[in-house]
Amino acid sequence: MWISADDFRLKAENFDLSNGFNILRIICGLFLFPHVMGKFAAGTVSAATVGFFAKAGFHPPEVWIYIAAISETAAGVALVLGICTRFAALGAVALLAIAVYSLQVVKGFGWTWNTGGYEYPVFWAITSLAVAIEAWKAHLRLTRPSLEPKHLKVAASS
């Protein structure tokens, strides 16, 4: 089954900070929130953000800004809480890939983040992809029966 009610449950184990995967998942979610806040100035859509979205080819830009903000918020909250992690992480990868594409369209090639390049979104896209892969592996371990033939299992000695 691709998704179940269990995917939406808050679990204490999702907040065990001795597990490095949880730390990475939570940080991936938290780092999406500044992107949401950066789209708005004084409670409204930032003029600079409207200009960027328009130059990137997203028309009408205001609508796409709200779609992006809602998507980033949803992915961020889900990653922080550990709900639907495998889908939220893939959503974050898609959002960040679109950000890289947009930067390429608007500014051309630029790698380093301090010059407006896409080093930062590429890094977080790869990190989110790693989170998605680990979440899918965990899901498959729980939902798939063991593929190891029974005759190869070592019998417990008495």
Regions found by a protein language model. Give the residues of each.
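Membrane-interface interhelical connector segments
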Residues: A41-P60
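Extended, low-polarity transmembrane helix blocks
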Residues: M1-A41, E62-I70, A74, L81-S158
